[in-house]
Regions:
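Aromatic, loop-rich ligand-recognition surfaces of beta-strand-rich domains
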Residues: 1-38
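Beta-strand-rich extracellular modules
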Residues: 17-21, 137-139, 156-160
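Beta-sheet-dominated interaction scaffolds and their linkers
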Residues: 39-76
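A short beta-turn/strand-edge loop motif at beta-sheet boundaries
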Residues: 76-85, 96
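Short beta-strand and strand-turn-strand segments in soluble, beta-rich domains
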Residues: 96-121
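Intrinsically disordered, low-complexity Pro/Gly/Ser/Thr-rich segments with frequent PxxP/GP/PP motifs
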Residues: 116-143
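Short glycine/proline/serine/threonine-rich loop/turn segments at secondary-structure transition edges
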Residues: 140-152
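Beta-sandwich strand segments
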Residues: 144-147, 160-173
């Protein structure tokens, strides 16, 4: 038997029971369930564990390079008859709280190094997922980024037509 769900399943409680027979492969690839605590329309993003995008900056005598190049979509918990406009912007005021919660000591990444493309997304009427994706990368003279603890850039989602998820409303780069 094969079952696939594309999109979202709306349920107050979700129970997943999987039974295997001895003649069937016992491989289960991946199941991720994210709980969004809100009964009101809420926007959120899902990008791996704890909405964290990682990458590295490599310093060489000839200059510095970065492998940071990621993208993510925005989602809504409730479809709207008029759709949603979701904005994504860096919010370095969240770095201290992140460091405290995760026992880290990242420095805030200055906006001059952050390249956000397509930072305003549209979730169409009746849809749950944005039509496009935000693309994020690093730009500029990266040789000045030398903090050995690393850097953090919180990318906060916001929408005038919906709330923002407390747990999944920020993507951390």
């Amino acid at each position: 038997m094969y079952a696939a769900f594309y999109g979202h399943i709306e349920a107050r409680y979700l129970r997943l029971t999987i039974g295997f027979s001895s003649s069937w492969s016992k491989t289960l690839s991946e199941i991720d369930i994210y709980k969004i605590d809100s009964e009101d329309p809420t926007v959120y993003a899902v990008t791996g564990t704890e909405n964290l995008i990682t990458g590295k900056i490599t310093h060489r005598q000839t200059g510095s390079t970065s492998d940071v190049n990621a993208s993510f979509s925005a989602y809504a918990t409730v479809a709207s008859t008029s759709g949603y406009t979701v904005s994504v912007a860096a919010d370095n005021s969240l770095v201290a709280a992140y460091n405290t919660a995760h026992d880290t000591s990242y420095a805030a990444l200055s906006a001059e190094y952050l390249q956000l493309d397509n930072s305003t997304l549209t979730i169409a009427a009746g849809a749950y997922k944005s039509e496009g994706e935000v693309t994020v990368s690093l730009k500029g003279d990266l040789t000045r980024l030398g903090d050995l603890n690393g850097y953090l850039a919180p990318l906060k989602l916001s929408s005038s037509g919906a709330g923002t998820s407390a747990g999944r409303g920020v993507v951390y780069l």
